[in-house]
Amino acid sequence: MIKPLPVVVLISGRGSNLQAIINAIADDELPIEIRAVVSNRPDAAGLQRPALLGIRTIVIDHACYASRHVFEAVLQTTIDAFEPGLLVLAGFMRILSAEFVTHYRGRILNIHPSLLPEFPGLNTHQRVLDAGKRESGATVHFVTPEMDGGPPILQARVPVLAGDDAVLLARRVLEQEHRILPLAIRWFAEGRVQLDAAGGVIFDGAPLERPRVLLPGGREPA
């Protein structure tokens, strides 16, 4: 029996990826304990579900602080009080400083709605369409000081269909996000994936030269 890994999740919005994590825990597929959900937005809809389940929810509104430095100092102190082994950014829409990210080096994951390194940043789906890409997807990666630049762990590929707009493409990509984020967290909790001293990903004891890719039908890569 693996001792549940203590986790803190950061969100800014609906929290659908958080819900996917909660569902995986309920299905005994994820050996973690969510100790707290923290949002930088008091109106984040994603705070409602964990609160109903008795998970601690905390709002640290970035708009209430004079600078990013002060905001992050409060955020870091709050997170560290829960002694997490992993910090998950599940739709957390704030750029974090190098100092903050370095504090959690090797134990902070993010989900991004593109096949990184392509299309980091915002407005991903429209940019994919504007570029005429035939494929998009989602990536779980370790967080480093470079925005969306940390080494990828796991990806899911999503075809771009005729007639797609940004909303339709985003919907299908989000379905895959809900699959790969809990899986990558499970790998981390089981000790299968780590960030090495040189900034590379180690998977099952060997360097991961390229991200694992979810198989058709949502099957875990062999």
What are these language model-derived features?
Residues 18, 46-47, 72, 125, ...:
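A general structural signal for well-ordered alpha-helical segments in protein cores
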Residues 39-40, 63-64, 68, 82-98:
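N-terminal glycine-rich "phosphate-gripper" loop used for MgATP/nucleotide binding
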Residues 1-45:
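N-terminal Rossmann-like dinucleotide-binding module
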Residues 58-63, 111:
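Short beta->alpha connector loops at strand-helix junctions that form conserved
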Residues 53-54, 104:
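Short, structured coil segments at secondary-structure junctions
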Residues 73-82:
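Short, well-structured alpha-helical segments in soluble
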Residues 8, 27, 123, 197-222:
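Internal anion-binding site segments
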Residues 24, 86, 90-204:
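Donor/substrate-binding cores of folate-linked one-carbon enzymes
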